[in-house]
């Protein structure tokens, strides 16, 4: 008798294929984040603030659109989430101009993020956002995985923000 909990070989291969695509997307998004942070950090603060305002308007518009109806809207949603996180990270890098400020800002974020993914963080706001699938998709960069229906959340706006903050601060400090 076959145990229902055991995965078939086909399902295991399908999961390995999905992990490949997720890893590929994460690497591409990380490299894109580094490149955009480097390029945008050379702009003036005023132009960064104007770009952030445009991205916020774009994000509000795309968040109100259904995901499955328009592929262009989906990509605009992903781009606005990515640029929004990067622009906020660069602005925070200007504000956190020293290593001490940066470290004192990042340590609580890392602790809260770690706690929210453990059983101790059931009541944290971050965990509640993650469990609400609609809000989580709106605050994530979602990509299709071949062989799977729907969209898969690759990374969140907060992750893009923190990564851009680290890269932007590194460019600014050193």
What do these predicted ranges mean?
Residues 1-174:
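A membrane-topology feature that recognizes alpha-helical transmembrane segments
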């Amino acid at each position: 008798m076959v145990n229902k909990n055991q995965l078939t070989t086909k399902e295991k291969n399908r999961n390995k294929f999905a992990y490949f695509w997720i890893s590929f997307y994460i690497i591409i998004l990380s490299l894109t984040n580094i490149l955009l942070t480097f390029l945008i950090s050379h702009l003036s603060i005023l132009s960064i603030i104007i770009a952030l305002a445009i991205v916020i308007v774009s994000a509000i518009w795309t968040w109100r659109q259904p995901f499955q109806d328009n592929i262009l809207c989906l990509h605009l949603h992903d781009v606005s989430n990515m640029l929004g996180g990067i622009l906020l990270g660069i602005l925070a890098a200007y504000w956190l101009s020293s290593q001490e400020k940066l470290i004192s800002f990042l340590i609580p974020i890392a602790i809260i993020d770690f706690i929210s993914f453990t059983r101790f963080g059931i009541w944290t706001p971050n965990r509640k956002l993650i469990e609400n699938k609609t809000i989580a998709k709106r605050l994530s960069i979602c990509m299709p995985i071949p062989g799977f229906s729907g969209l898969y959340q690759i990374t969140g706006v907060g992750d893009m923000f923190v990564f851009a903050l680290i890269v932007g601060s590194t460019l600014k400090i050193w």
